[in-house]
Amino acid sequence: ALVTTVKSTIPNKNTAFERFTASGPLALLPVAKNHCAVVWTRTDEDAKALMLGSEADFLAELQQCFGFKLGELSLTAPRRAFPLSLIRAEKMVADRAVIIGNAVHQLHPVAGQGFNLGLRDVVNLAEMLITQHEQNKDIGAADFLKKYAISRKKDHDRTIGFTDAVVKIFSNEWLALAAARNIGLALLDH
């Protein structure tokens, strides 16, 4: 994935944008009135070429993939690249401790799903903690924490499966899959 920060000529109105393009998902996340963090999923080969190319070439490709919804974009931070990998923690609870969201798993940065998963973890844990406290039970008890971990497993599995599938769909150039993906994107765009 490629990351950087850009300035736009049109304010972002605190709105996050994500485009699912044939070359990979592209997200612009608001950090200030006219500034967005960029998270751009590309193949390793594409990412290397974009990192080795000029800033002007990088911006031209970024603008072409994103469009002009925020006007013209300019870089305000260095470009960085890092490999995407899916990492799952073996356990999300231990002795009187819980880890949640992206602290438990490293998901592909697609559709804000790591953030959304973290929010759902917090809501579920808060509800369970309130119930445990109202019943005057130990909120750090091993059986309680295990129950929490079990309650979150299905959502974690589903979310991880979804994000992994989206990345595989966009990084696969098998002709039939690429054609189906491009048709789907064209339909979503209209």
Language model features: what each stretch is:
Residues 108-121:
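A conserved FAD-binding loop/helix module that cradles the flavin
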Residues 21-83:
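Conserved FAD/dinucleotide-binding core of flavoprotein oxidoreductases
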Residues 9-11, 43-47, 104-106:
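A short, flexible beta-alpha/helix-coil linker loop
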Residues 3-12, 22, 31:
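Glycine-rich loop(s) and the adjacent beta-strand/alpha-helix scaffold that form part
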Residues 90-110:
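Short FAD-binding loop at a beta-strand-to-alpha-helix junction that anchors the flavin cofactor
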Residues 127-190:
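C-terminal helical "tail/cap" subdomain of flavin- and related membrane-associated enzymes
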